């Protein structure tokens, strides 16, 4: 009965143009915070889950110790925000700073992933808003990221932020072995 009342409420709110993205189906204690070293195992779980979704499981080859050292060692090269739901890491936004000779400092979002159980409940939006705050704090002029062209849910999510597509660019990478 609670779910039916909730759904009826959502439909009525949508009729009046009220943003329902931040309403939750059940009470949750969600905290968006900077990642700490102890989060790395759960973060790697989310990264593997994302790779599975993107049909690229075999591409996750990073050694766990290297991953931890790269984020929390003396010369850290990445940082992350996590979404903690009732004390468990259920979302991740991993980023690093890069430099554009045309634009200056840019925050590059490597991965934004929320456990599928919690998608559509406003957690991704809260993480994106927190990431925008980090970019402003670090004096970055923009945030860049990539999305697979078939990942329509992600594209739809990002388009809510009035984003620009970098049409005409081809991505390259070179394996160093």
Label the model's feature ranges:
Residues 120-133, 160:
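Conserved acetyl-CoA-binding loop-helix of GNAT-fold acetyltransferases
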Residues 70-82:
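A short helix-loop-beta-strand connector motif used in the catalytic cores of GNAT acetyltransferases and
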Residues 82, 88-96:
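Conserved beta-strand in the GNAT
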Residues 136-146:
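Conserved GNAT acetyl-CoA-binding A-motif
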Residues 112-119:
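A short, internal acetyl-CoA/4′-phosphopantetheine-binding micro-motif in the GNAT/acyltransferase core
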Residues 31-43:
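A short beta-loop-alpha structural element at the N-terminal edge
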Residues 125, 137, 149-168, 174:
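Conserved active-site alpha-helix within GNAT-family acetyltransferase domains
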Residues 44-70:
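Conserved GNAT-fold acetyl-CoA-binding loop/helix
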